[in-house]
């Protein structure tokens, strides 16, 4: 018996020593791999060699699966060898499913593998993989929620918003059952965002009301609570801005700005909630700051506070540049493109066409780096080029750009914006496009079935109808449309539309010989245009003031207005020549495919300047 016991003890000791040796070689290889991965610069080839050296030891299944996951992750994140990355991740997923209590490896492998499939445009392989992982992860709240978010995002990228909303609804109910009101709010707010994108406003309102109650009642980590509030307020603000309600949005926007100030003062401790389902964060604090700058720029642009828009754009772009040095998140490029889109429109209004053109070129370069970004912003890019073409009086190119943009968009508000601008191009062109123009005006008829709910776009449609009636010589009809624009733009502080309507009304009264009423319109138009500042309206107003004062015998005032008009003309003319001389001016001929990679310099401008003088 004693001999048997001694032999057993000896065998156990040998087994323990063997296990210890196995542990030591594994830990040594793992340590080396991690050392090489975190070196500066990372030595990825050596890291991969160390991890591959694990397999000849015939390790247990757990170590084998985890090593395949580590190799797949390193190859996916640090190399272009997607084939090997896929092979390792597929093995990790396959082996880990056979091992009980191995959730972290199993679901991380599924999550990474589906990401890789999407990157390779194998979405049909990613969907069933995620569905299976979701099905078997119900006892693991963190992973179940994360995988639901991931599949919802995949459907969103495919523009299948109905399926994405369904999944987010499932996630919200699951989060409620497992007692995570925080993650329930994240699911519901994400669903609200998609419903806003789909324009399902009847569903959005009760959902946002419920979200507001959940956010206010939730007692948890202050940063998480404030980030939920930022998400909620961003949705409210963008909802108002989409509806063109620039004045009504002000209280929400002010709350949002106060909220982001509160977040920036909170200490950024690592959040370790007791409920694993709460281990999510909507956006990093720095990204939220940029987002709040962005919606502030959107508001300033719509309201016609263009200097304020410029100030916040500069702040946001500076912060984005810092963030992009450390973080290659695609959302940062999206923020940058949206900011540039808004500031380009500001530049065109304030008479800085050359700068606007260079920024359009910058958007092209960002879109060249990301096919998805280009797909999402191609219509906006052609719209901006159309607006630039109008500003330099290249009307045929403007028509081509707007027509291209219409072909590329399904977004109703953008469609209405493009059609409104295209109609104004046709109006300025005279009788060349009468049939098409009548068709367009009927499709954006603000008196009948206007296609979108935007207050701002509807007011703009009234203005375009007024402009058309003015060119047709139907002055009473023009006055009716323009007064409607004024009523709507005053109600929501739409300063640019107010200025444009006032100066056009002033022009009508001048043509009708009612000089006093004309003056009553043109003087406030000039004041408002100076405040925006809108160079085209200032040019137009100063010309009218010159003619008005001349007609009324006010020689000194007429001379002063003429001098102002001359100054504005010179500024616009200089900027016009500079813009048309840039190699980027060739972008106006691009109407198909991805953005051109480079531009050939021209000998000089080839556009008419008559409209400016």
Swiss-Prot record:
Keyword Cell division annotated: yes
Gene3D superfamilies according to UniProt: Tetratricopeptide repeat domain
Superkingdom in the source lineage: Eukaryota
Main localization, broad class: nucleus
UniProt protein name: MAU2 chromatid cohesion factor homolog
Keyword Cell cycle belongs to the record: yes
Similarity annotation: Belongs to the SCC4/mau-2 family.
SMART domains per record: TPR
Organism: Homo sapiens (Human)
TPR repeats: 107-140, 379-412, 459-492, 499-532
Function: Plays an important role in the loading of the cohesin complex on to DNA. Forms a heterodimeric complex (also known as cohesin loading complex) with NIPBL/SCC2 which mediates the loading of the cohesin complex onto chromatin. Plays a role in sister chromatid cohesion and normal progression through prometaphase.
Subcellular location(s) per record: Nucleus, Nucleoplasm; Nucleus; Chromosome
Description of how the protein assembles with itself and partners: Heterodimerizes with MAU2/SCC2 to form the cohesin loading complex. The NIPBL-MAU2 heterodimer interacts with the SMC1A-SMC3 heterodimer and with the cohesin complex composed of SMC1A, SMC3, RAD21 and STAG1.
PANTHER family the record matches: MAU2 CHROMATID COHESION FACTOR HOMOLOG
Span list, region Sufficient for interaction with NIPBL: 1-115
Cellular component GO terms, alphabetical: chromatin; nuclear body; nucleoplasm; nucleus; Scc2-Scc4 cohesin loading complex; SMC loading complex
Pfam families attached to this UniProt entry: Cohesin_load
Entry-linked InterPro entries: MAU2 (IPR019440), TPR-like_helical_dom_sf (IPR011990), TPR_rpt (IPR019734)
Gene Ontology MF: a single term: cohesin loader activity
């Amino acid at each position: 018996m004693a001999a048997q016991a001694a032999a057993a003890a000896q065998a156990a000791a040998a087994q323990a020593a063997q296990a210890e040796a196995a542990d030591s070689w594994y830990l040594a290889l793992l340590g080396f791999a991690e050392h090489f991965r975190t070196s500066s610069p990372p030595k990825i080839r050596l890291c991969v060699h160390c991890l591959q050296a694990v397999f000849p030891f015939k390790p247990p299944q757990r170590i084998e699966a985890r090593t395949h996951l580590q190799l797949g992750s390193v190859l996916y994140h640090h190399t272009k060898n997607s084939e090997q990355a896929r092979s390792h991740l597929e093995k990790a997923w396959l082996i880990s499913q056979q091992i009980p209590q191995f959730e972290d490896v199993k679901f991380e492998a599924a999550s990474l593998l589906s990401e890789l499939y999407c990157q390779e445009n194998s979405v049909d392989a990613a969907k069933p993989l995620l569905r299976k992982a979701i099905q078997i992860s119900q006892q693991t709240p963190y992973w179940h929620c994360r995988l639901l978010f991931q599949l919802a995002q995949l459907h969103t990228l495919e523009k299948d918003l109905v399926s994405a909303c369904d999944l987010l609804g499932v996630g919200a109910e699951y989060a409620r059952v497992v007692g995570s009101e925080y993650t329930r709010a994240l699911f519901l707010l994400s669903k609200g965002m998609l419903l806003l994108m789909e324009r399902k406003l009847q569903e959005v309102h009760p959902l946002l009301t419920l979200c507001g109650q959940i956010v206010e009642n939730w007692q948890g980590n202050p940063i998480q609570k404030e980030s939920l509030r930022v998400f909620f307020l961003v949705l409210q603000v963008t909802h108002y801005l989409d509806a063109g309600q620039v004045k009504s949005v002000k209280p929400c926007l002010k709350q949002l700005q106060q909220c982001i100030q509160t977040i920036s003062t909170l200490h950024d401790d690592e959040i370790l909630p007791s409920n694993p389902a709460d281990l999510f964060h909507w956006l990093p604090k720095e990204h939220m700051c940029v987002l709040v700058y962005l919606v502030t720029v959107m508001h300033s642009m719509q309201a016609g506070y263009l200097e304020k828009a410029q100030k916040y754009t500069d702040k946001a772009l500076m912060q984005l540049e810092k963030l992009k040095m450390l973080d290659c998140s695609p959302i940062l490029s999206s923020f940058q493109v949206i900011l540039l889109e808004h500031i380009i429109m500001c530049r065109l209004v304030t008479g800085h066409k050359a700068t606007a053109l260079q920024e359009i070129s910058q958007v092209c370069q960002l879109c060249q780096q990301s096919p998805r970004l280009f797909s999402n912003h191609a219509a906006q890019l052609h719209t901006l080029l159309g607006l630039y073409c109008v500003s330099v009086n290249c009307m045929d190119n403007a028509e081509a750009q707007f027509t291209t943009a219409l072909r590329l968009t399904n977004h109703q508000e953008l469609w209405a914006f493009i059609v409104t601008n295209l109609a104004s191009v046709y109006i300025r062109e005279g009788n060349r496009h009468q049939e098409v123009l009548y068709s367009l005006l009927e499709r954006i008829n603000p008196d009948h079935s206007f296609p979108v709910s935007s207050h701002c776009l509807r007011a703009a449609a009234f203005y375009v109808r007024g402009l058309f009636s003015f060119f047709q010589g139907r002055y009473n009809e023009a006055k009716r449309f323009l007064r409607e624009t004024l009523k709507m733009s005053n109600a929501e502080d739409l300063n640019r539309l107010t200025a444009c309507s006032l100066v056009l009304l002033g022009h009508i009264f001048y043509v009708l010989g009612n000089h006093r009423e004309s003056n009553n319109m043109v003087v406030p138009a000039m004041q408002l245009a100076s405040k925006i500042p809108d160079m085209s309206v200032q040019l137009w107003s100063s010309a009218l003031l010159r003619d008005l004062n001349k007609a009324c015998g006010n020689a000194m005032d007429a001379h002063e207005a003429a001098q102002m008009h001359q100054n504005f003309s010179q500024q616009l003319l200089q900027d016009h020549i500079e813009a048309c001389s840039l190699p980027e001016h060739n972008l106006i001929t691009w109407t198909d495919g991805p953005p051109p990679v480079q531009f050939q310099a021209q000998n000089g401008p080839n556009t008419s300047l008559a409209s400016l003088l």
